[in-house]
Amino acid sequence: MLPSQLIGFLLLWVPASRGEIVLTQSPDFQSVTPKEKVTITCRASQSIGSSLHWYQQKPDQSPKLLIKYASQSFSGVPSRFSGSGSGTDFTLTINSLEAEDAATYYCHQSSSLP
């Protein structure tokens, strides 16, 4: 059995004009095996429309954008990664997990991308 670590920050604080938006991600850790389906959720403390992005970060590497604006796959990202949701509830799904997917995954709220 080859476990994959899927770790996310539980709270991300993002300043906004209407006050701070808190993103709560779960689970904070998940051990799974290849070929499994993995679901990671992100909940915003107030509605953010579709301004939610998902990133993958591997050790000693910069974060890689996977999904932009809740459900739009970024160029070159494998089709097993998908995103959904709007308003306050969002989901990142990895279908048929591969060993190379072992990483930290996190959500980020922003109306624009860097």
UniProtKB/Swiss-Prot annotation:
Residues 20-42 are annotated as: Framework-1. One of its GO terms (biological process) is adaptive immune response. Residues 54-68 are annotated as: Framework-2. Residues 108-114 are annotated as: Complementarity-determining-3. Residues 43-53 are annotated as: Complementarity-determining-1. It is found in: Secreted; Cell membrane. Residues 20-114 form the Ig-like domain. Keywords: Adaptive immunity, Cell membrane, Disulfide bond, Immunity, Immunoglobulin, Immunoglobulin domain, Membrane, Secreted, Signal. InterPro entries: Ig-like_dom (IPR007110), Ig-like_dom_sf (IPR036179), Ig-like_fold (IPR013783), Ig_sub (IPR003599), Ig_V-set (IPR013106), IgV_Light_Chain (IPR050150). V region of the variable domain of immunoglobulin light chains that participates in the antigen recognition. Immunoglobulins, also known as antibodies, are membrane-bound or secreted glycoproteins produced by B lymphocytes. In the recognition phase of humoral immunity, the membrane-bound immunoglobulins serve as receptors which, upon binding of a specific antigen, trigger the clonal expansion and differentiation of B lymphocytes into immunoglobulins-secreting plasma cells. This is Immunoglobulin kappa variable 6-21.
